Amino acid sequence: TGNLGEASIGLNLLKQKKQNLKSAEKICLKRFLKPEINFLFSQDLSKIANSCIDISDGLMADLNHICEQSNLKAEINLDNVPLIGNPITAITWGDDYQLCFTIGSSKLKKLVEISKKHKIKITNIGKLNKGKGISVLSKGKKINIKKAGYNHFNG
């Protein structure tokens, strides 16, 4: 759901103590300082999703939890990920309080209804296959991601 990268930009703006923010910068700062969680959307989504996780520790780190628990490999198309700023930072940084979920194709119509009802932006960024881990593709080529996201034990 939503855009990735806004919170990391918001944190950088806060660190820089930047004044006279543009409207897009104000949104990023708000995403970092006062993230919004749509509980009603989450409740409706829980009725049709196969799995779901908030990606507050970063898309890569949290999607990996889904992969480990389902014994499947995720393939992300980076070109489809709605993001702001540096693409690698956007998918590895935390604090974007968005959801990553999996859903069967038979539930897509219901998903569209739910997203419209709650005015939540949803995007198909990839798929699950047999295997382990996560591969990230950009323009059809696999790219290497060194940092996976926030780790509560290592920081």
Where are these regions (language model features)?
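Helix-biased detector of long, well-ordered alpha-helical tracts
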Residues: 1-155
